A protein has these predicted regions:
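Active-site loop-to-helix "anion-binding N-cap" substructures in soluble metabolic enzymes
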Residues: 1-251
Length: 251
């Protein structure tokens, strides 16, 4: 039985005091949540205080990026070792915004996945197709390429530690969302690709989140699908009360 993981991705929003205030509110709201793992991805400047703000709760903290080296002369970069040292447990990798704006390749994302696993943290690997790719019938081709590239050369033992987040790019921040049935169909195809790579037993253990404009209104229907194991939530995670409504839908 896969455990639901509902994660928020704050992107480049919230200063430190705003982050601490929101996390303190979320910690209080979720104190009785037992059936869902809760994660918040926060900006680098907030991470240390974010970890302290949720200490002793079932809310965990993620970084939104890393550089795939443990240390070295890489001016301006942050290593997974630095993040683990302050108590960060997850890292969001391969988000469509990183792929588009910073031209991150599947090969580079794969290096990041390996670096995060090597240090004992949990990667959340984002995959997703653009609108023209979906309309052109290339959804599965695009996702398979991203999965096979992002998870290349991983052992079965490593693969089960990775969370895959399917985020249709056409649904991020647009208000559009896949129907629960569309999302389930794609998640099943993603799991089939994982089974090709690592075998069915491993694929059945890998958590696959949905991340295309999940909000309180559609969360329950999405999370009730067989192959949807949580959410990677953008805008609706910025307020503790709306994020809590999504968590309740999973709990």
């Amino acid at each position: 039985m896969r455990r639901l993981v509902i994660a928020g991705n704050w992107k480049m929003y919230k200063n430190n005091s705003e982050a601490v205030a929101t996390l303190t509110e979320l910690k209080n709201l979720t104190k009785d949540v037992n059936n869902v793992d809760i994660v918040i991805g926060a900006p680098f400047t907030c991470l240390s205080d974010a970890v302290k703000a949720v200490a002793g709760s079932n809310v965990k903290i993620a970084a939104e990026n890393i550089y795939p080296k443990i240390e070295g002369a890489y001016t301006g970069e942050i290593s997974p070792k630095m993040l683990k040292d302050i108590g960060v447990e997850y890292v969001i990798l391969g988000h469509s915004e990183r792929r588009e704006y910073f031209k991150e390749s599947d090969e580079f994302i794969n290096q990041k996945v390996k670096a995060v696993l090597e240090i004992g943290m949990k990667p959340i690997l984002c995959i997703g197709e653009k609108l023209e790719e979906r309309e052109g019938g290339k959804t599965l081709e695009v996702l398979a390429t991203q999965i096979k590239g992002g998870l290349a050369d991983l052992s079965k033992e490593e693969a089960v530690k990775v969370i895959v987040a399917y985020e249709p790019v056409w649904a991020i921040g647009t208000g559009k969302t896949a129907t629960p049935e569309m999302a389930q169909e794609t998640h099943k195809e993603v799991r089939n690709v994982l089974a090709e790579m690592f075998g069915k037993e491993v694929a059945d253990k890998i958590i696959i989140q949905y991340g295309g404009s999940m909000k309180p209104e559609n969360a329950k229907d999405l999370l009730s699908q067989e192959d949807i194991d949580g959410g990677l939530v953008g805008g609706a995670s910025l307020k503790a009360d709306s994020f809590f409504e999504i968590i309740k839908a999973g709990n």
